[in-house]
Structures are given as structure tokens and as C-alpha cells.
């Protein structure tokens, strides 16, 4: 028997319930966040299917998304696997799990059909929807018909979010048919500009968070992760709305917000600047540095704010 320390996400209980319903339980591991996991799985004698199989990226097994059948493993291997992948899922945005009517071969074939997404200009892009920072945005961005296509063969989809919490993104009693590949591996899903923008914005937020953690590591580490992410997302969006769409100028704006718990950017001088922000980083940086001292003293740093949980 496992306990909460071995299986903090209760994956074994979920897999057992899936089996009792006559379904398969799968884990999906984005090994770009945990490189060379395929070697670990081989040493554990755990079967898997790579979603890169048959794709150009097939030559990169060390970073491939791997589909793992949990419900077909003996108790000991299942416990070892769950203990290991749970640690990975809490450490990096890499773990999701699926209940499906399909077997490993057929479910992997279905998921491979979403390796690329078409764009409105006729181009196609590799779609790393299995990165769990992107997965909820991907599900949100899809139209009703596209979502039905993507969730073919699925009864549920859940993942570990960026805050280390398990979230269910999809659950249904009705199973849609699995997708069928198009000739010449053409994308099954084409994103319009709005959908593409949602996915780009999600990537931009992570890029800005990474940059801020590099610039002020101690300060960002002092904040609860949810507080930091939600605060940065809100002020990045305000910067975008003012036409500040590059990460360097956004960093300067968000730093002012962080160092003043948001009060500094409400100062009339900053609001006036954001009506017509300089296009260059140097010009924008100089304009912020030239602000009166009261701007930078408008509020306490967010990490020293006693009202921040």
C-alpha cells in the first residue's frame, strides 16, 4: 500500500478507479523539463510512447513528451513510477494525466496529431501544449469544435499547475472519437490571431518571470509563488495595453510596481509617461530614473508589504 508521501497526487487511486471503469490511465511527461527521462524509464522497465515518433524531432528522445501507461503496470513498478513522476511534476511544469478509452498505441497516435498547429498566415508551428504552463491556455484558446477534436478518446485531463496544485482541466462522461491524421501531416488545428495571441502572451509571462528572478532573485524568492505570478501578470498586461510590448521595457515597469507594491505606477508622472512611452529601452529607462523620488517611495516593496499573504 502507498501513502500520501509516496503518491501525493493520488495517481494510483485514480488509475485503479479508471481500470474499474474499463478505461486506461496515462501519465504524460514533458521531458524537456526533465531531460533524459527516457533512460530512467527504461531502467525501471516502464513502457512508453514518444509523441515525437514519426516527427522531425524524433531524433531528440531526451526531450520528447512521453506517454506512460499507468494502469497496465504491476503494483511495485506503478508505485516507483508515481513516486518519481510526482517529484518531477512538483519541481517543473511537466506532468499531466489522462483517462482514456484508447490503448497506448492509439492514444499516442491521437495526441501526435496536435504536434503542429496551423497559423492564419499559412505557416505552422510546433505546439508544446504538454508544457503545463501552456496546457491550460491551449485548452482555453481552442474553439468548441477544436476542443472536441483534441479531447477525442479522453474522459478526463488533469495536471500539476505552476503552484504545485493538481487541477482538472477536462472531464466528461461522453467520449469523442479520436482524431485522424491528415495527409502530409497537415495540422488538424489552425489558430486564428486571437488564439495565437493568447499562447504568445502565456509564453511572454514566463519569460518575464524568469528575467525578474534573475535580476532580483532574493526578492522574488521571498514572495509566495502565486502572489508573484498574479502580480507580474497584472502589471505586464498594463504595460502591454500602453504599447510597451517588449520584455526589457516591461521589466522596468514591473520592477517599479514590485518595489512600490504597485503604488509607484499610479503616480501621475508615471501615468503621463505611459501615455507616450519611449520606444527604446535606454529612453524608457532614463525616463523612469528621472521620476521624482516620491514615485519610488510611493509604497513598500511587495516582499515587505505586510498585507501580502
For the regions a protein language model found, what residue spans apply to each?
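Contiguous, structured surface segment used for ligand recognition
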Residues: 69-73, 82-89
Amino acid at each position: 500500500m502507498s501513502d500520501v508521501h509516496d503518491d501525493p497526487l493520488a495517481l494510483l487511486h485514480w488509475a485503479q478507479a479508471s481500470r474499474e471503469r474499463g478505461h486506461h490511465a496515462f501519465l504524460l511527461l514533458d521531458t524537456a523539463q526533465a531531460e533524459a527521462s527516457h533512460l530512467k524509464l527504461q531502467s525501471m522497465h516502464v513502457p512508453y510512447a514518444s509523441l515525437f515518433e514519426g516527427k522531425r524531432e524524433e531524433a531528440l528522445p531526451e526531450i520528447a513528451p512521453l506517454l506512460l501507461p499507468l494502469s497496465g503496470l504491476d503494483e511495485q513498478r506503478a508505485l516507483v513510477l508515481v513516486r518519481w513522476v510526482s517529484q518531477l511534476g512538483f519541481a517543473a511544469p511537466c506532468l499531466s494525466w489522462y483517462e482514456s478509452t484508447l490503448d497506448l498505441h492509439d492514444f499516442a497516435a491521437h495526441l501526435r496529431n496536435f504536434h503542429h498547429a496551423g497559423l492564419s498566415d499559412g505557416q505552422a508551428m510546433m505546439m508544446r501544449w504538454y508544457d503545463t504552463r501552456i496546457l491550460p491556455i491551449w485548452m482555453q484558446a481552442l474553439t468548441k469544435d477544436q476542443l472536441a477534436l483534441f479531447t477525442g478518446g479522453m474522459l478526463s485531463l488533469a495536471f500539476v499547475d505552476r503552484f504545485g496544485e493538481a487541477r482538472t482541466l477536462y472531464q466528461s462522461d461522453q467520449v469523442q472519437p479520436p482524431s485522424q491524421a491528415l495527409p502530409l501531416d497537415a495540422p488538424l488545428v489552425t489558430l486564428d490571431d486571437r488564439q495565437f495571441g493568447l499562447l504568445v502572451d502565456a509564453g511572454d509571462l514566463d519569460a518575464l518571470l524568469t528575467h525578474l528572478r534573475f535580476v532580483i532573485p532574493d526578492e522574488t524568492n521571498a514572495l509566495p509563488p502565486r502572489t508573484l505570478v498574479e502580480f507580474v501578470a497584472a502589471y505586464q498586461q498594463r504595460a502591454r495595453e500602453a504599447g510597451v510590448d517588449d520584455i526589457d521595457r516591461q521589466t522596468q515597469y514591473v520592477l517599479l510596481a514590485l518595489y512600490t507594491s504597485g503604488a509607484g505606477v499610479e503616480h501621475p508622472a508615471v501615468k503621463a509617461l505611459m501615455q507616450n512611452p519611449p520606444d527604446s529601452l535606454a529612453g524608457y529607462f532614463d525616463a523612469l530614473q528621472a521620476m521624482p523620488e516620491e514615485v519610488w517611495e510611493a509604497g513598500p516593496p511587495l516582499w515587505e508589504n505586510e498585507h501580502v499573504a
